[in-house]
Design a protein with these regions (language model features):
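Hydrophobic residues within beta-strands of alpha/beta enzymes
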Residues: 32-34, 100, 147, 182, ...
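Domain-core and long-helix interface of multi-subunit machines
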Residues: 10-11, 102-209
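An N-terminally biased module of ancient metal coordination in phosphate/nucleic-acid-related enzymes
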Residues: 1-82, 94-96, 154-166, 170-171, ...
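Acidic (Asp/Glu)-rich catalytic clusters
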Residues: 25-26, 56-69, 89-98, 137-143, ...
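Short, acidic/polar
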Residues: 13-23, 83-91, 129-140
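Hydrophobic alpha-helical segments and helix pairs
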Residues: 78-120
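Short, basic/aromatic-enriched C-terminal tail that caps enzymatic domains
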Residues: 236, 240-257
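Conserved active-site loop/cleft motifs that coordinate metal ions or position small ligands
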Residues: 183, 213-218, 243-247
Length: 257
């Protein structure tokens, strides 16, 4: 089994890469991917751009050190910021990544993932429209391999007033058209929403439109690695998935469940 989304002390995690590797081995994982935050905005929870060579060196060293025990992939979780595509691409091209997760944490300058003060500025329907429009733009950008926690806008139990299935499905169609993967992120179970991201409805849409998925815990400490995976695998099977995907050098491969 794989866990493709985790953070170290270089961004907003609590453990070193090696501590994460050792726990993943202890938990019996076959493959993990490190995905520290990279963001063009001046945030405290992302790796400093000048520290990217340190990140690269540490991960490459661990790949070699533990190659007989576990596969280690080098990913990043990159914030998508509209209008910054060229700068984002410049960063990605300098890093020998196996895959890139594209995530949305900002609507304009508002970090909705940490700052609850602007909730209520718009109707929830309008908020969802703004958020998923950004997801669609990220998918069309050609920058990413995986869309991260696709419905994270629900994190603080903020849900649309009316049915948004058309918005969700249009987003999934765009993701499919641009040959991207969606992660089933189990970290949502430990957030206020207490749901996987995506939840059942959007995951079912992914399956309907033949969008591949991968599996991730969004671990910010070593004890969170592979959290809720048993339930996640059951959900994938319930929806109809029999396989997930992994990456190496930004090339996908199939992993049977």
């Amino acid at each position: 089994m794989v866990d493709y989304h985790m953070h170290s002390v270089l961004s907003d995690g609590k453990n070193s890469y090696e501590e994460m590797v050792l726990m993943a081995i202890e938990k019996g994982l076959d493959e993990i991917g490190f995905t520290d935050h990279v963001c063009l905005k001046p945030v405290t929870w992302a790796i400093r751009l000048e520290d990217i060579p340190v990140m690269t060196s540490q991960i490459i060293d661990l790949k070699e050190k533990y190659e007989d025990q576990i596969k280690i992939r080098y990913g990043i979780e990159m914030d998508y910021l509209p209008g910054k595509e060229e700068q984002i691409n410049d960063i990605i091209e300098r890093i020998p990544v196996d895959y890139v997760i594209g995530s949305i944490h900002f609507i304009g300058d508002w970090n909705f993932d940490t700052d609850q003060s602007f909730y209520g500025k718009w109707t929830n329907d309008k908020l969802y429209e703004k958020y998923f429009t950004l997801v669609q733009q990220a998918a069309k950008s050609g920058l990413f391999d995986i869309i991260g926690h696709i419905d994270i806008i629900k994190k603080f139990r903020v849900y649309p007033e009316s049915n948004q299935d058309l918005l969700f499905e249009d987003t999934i169609k765009i993701i499919k058209a641009n040959n991207l993967v969606v992660e089933l992120n189990t970290g949502g179970m430990d957030r206020p929403c207490a749901e996987f991201t995506p939840g059942y409805k959007i995951l079912e849409m992914c399956y309907k439109h033949h969008v591949p998925v991968t599996l991730s815990s969004d671990a910010h400490s070593n004890i969170q690695i592979a959290r809720h995976f048993e339930s996640a695998i059951e959900l994938l099977a319930q929806v109809g998935y029999t396989e997930i995907v992994g990456f190496k050098n930004r090339i996908r491969r199939i992993i049977r469940l």
